[in-house]
Amino acid sequence: MSGEHLQVVHGDITRMEVDAIVNAANSGLLGGGGVDGAIHGAGGSAIKEACRAIRDTQGGCPTGEAVITTGGHLPAPYVIHAVGPVWQGGDQGEDELLANAYRNSIRLAAQHHLRRLAFPNISTGIYAFPRERAADIAIAAVREALAAAPEIEQVTFVCFDDENYRLYRERLS
């Protein structure tokens, strides 16, 4: 996939009309603050029930991994819940865990024959991952994963805040 298939928008990921939106989830999968809470709130109880079923069968989702559920009431029919790392100074494998969250989301989308995805800025909110570093990792990891998933036609980075939007726009222009 070439660079023109990556784009950035400033907005609300819960309104994206794509095949799947990615949720910056916590390992318990039961919703939280920020984008996680917004997605659970907008998608309704079907998302929470699907997450609870995953939690009951596999005990949640480890950091760097991803699981897929229904999109509930969202415009996107699926939600991929990716668990990014909490920033702990950068010497606890955070870079690779963040890259894996993006890579595993792409792999899961490809396995489910999805073509258009939207990502939030994973780990840059309450998890405090440095935004510039996270943007570099996210773009590189997505490009790497897309090389092995040619069926994916479009990836949109949906930035809720001005700083992330500026960082992604600079890197993708």
UniProtKB/Swiss-Prot annotation:
Ranges of residues in domain Macro: 1-173
Pfam families to which the protein is assigned, alphabetical: Macro (PF01661)
Transmembrane segments: none
InterPro entries found in the cross-reference section: Macro_dom, Macro_dom-like
NCBIfam families for the chain: PRK00431.1-6
Record-stated family: Belongs to the MacroD-type family.
The name this protein goes by in its record: Macro domain-containing protein in gbd 3'region
Organism name: Cupriavidus necator
